[in-house]
Amino acid sequence: MKILITVGIYPPDIGGPASFVPKIAKLLTENNFDVTIICLTDKKIVDKEKFVVKRIIRRQNLLFRWVKTIFSIIRHGYNAEVIFVNGLPMESYIANIFLRKNLIRKVVGDWAWERGRNKGLIDESFDEFQSNSHNLHLEIAKFSRGWTATKANMVITPSKHLSDVVNNWGVKRDKLKVIYNGTKISNTKTDAYDKSDNSSNTLNFITVGRLAPWKNIDVIIESMNEIRKTIENFKLFVVGSGPLEKDLKNQTNKLGLDDKVIFTGQKTSEELKNYYKNSQIYIQASGYEGLPHVLLEAINYDLTLISTPVGGSNEVIENGKNGWLIDLVNGVKPDPIDLSKIIVDVINSKDSRDEKMSNAKNLLNTKFDEEVNLLEYLKVFQQ
């Protein structure tokens, strides 16, 4: 069977789809599927995979890129039996008007909401955005993301919460399927932080992701300003890049935290492993997450979790059973002082910390095993 996969980001890009697509393409190829990927890219790269990767330059005239992408999907989708859409949804739908192929869509978020936050057009929570009215630009974007989803034969989401959201876009329940994200489970036990020996240990926090408005990295940095009043030896690793990088670095400098907050830039999955291994606490302050793969990775490396209870994150934290929760103020972002208090509580609660870490590890093995969950996708295509 021939399968065409479309995606907006692909390695060396960083993000959920960029991590997922190579894995599912590899699995499909190993099971005798003929796979072609069409993706956007910042520069041409020679790919040496057993599947075909067709890259389209991202930074060019938008109309020209759209036309080129649509024609590329038509060309490579002509002999395909299935189009698996992980990005480029409108281009894929327009191409499929002519192709009339089975179309499976994976939805991991709401690009209309992300666009509104990135452009500073809105300052509201993900869930509020779904029901509120907005300007014409955003209403068109909301219509587009929902309408293209309804045209798919099946829509897969990585969380029950997101499945409910997509159902409200107009996709019928019998077309929806939840397949959780997963991580490769391995024995990666690291030395836990011992607060009794703080004089010789540095407590390392880490947060990973795109430096975008809804990630609320500014709140995490502000909480570090409070933390240093009680803890001397600590560092925060901010892994990733994005539109707010310059602003966040300026904030760090103004707070005098340049020696405490380390911006690493984008890192490969192999490079990221070392940061996980050398950290003790993972902090997520996002206003929304579909189902964050980084939380699963953090569990795999025995990090204690602090997270906002948003989207699919609560399906990982399970109302505080597997980590600590920090509430959002007005549904948008946490309060930095509240976050700093929770961090101190985590450090001073060894028994509770160990119990939650154990619970999280058990959940990872039963619900978020990457190998098991990828096989669920394989079953979809085999059917």
Regions found by a protein language model. Give the residues of each.
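Short alpha-helical donor nucleotide-sugar binding micro-motif in glycosyltransferases
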Residues: 77, 149, 266-267, 274-279
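Membrane-proximal helix-turn-helix segments that form the acceptor-binding/catalytic region
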Residues: 71-78, 127-155
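Short hydrophobic beta-strand element within catalytic cores of glycosyltransferases
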Residues: 304-307, 317
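Conserved donor-binding/catalytic core segment of Leloir-type glycosyltransferases
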Residues: 4-6, 156, 197-215, 220-224, ...
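Aromatic "clamp/platform" in nucleotide-sugar-dependent glycosyltransferases that forms part
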Residues: 287
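Acceptor-binding helix/loop patch of EC 2.4 sugar-transfer enzymes
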Residues: 104-143
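Nucleotide-activated donor-binding/catalytic signature segment of Leloir-type glycosyltransferases, i.e.
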Residues: 249-267
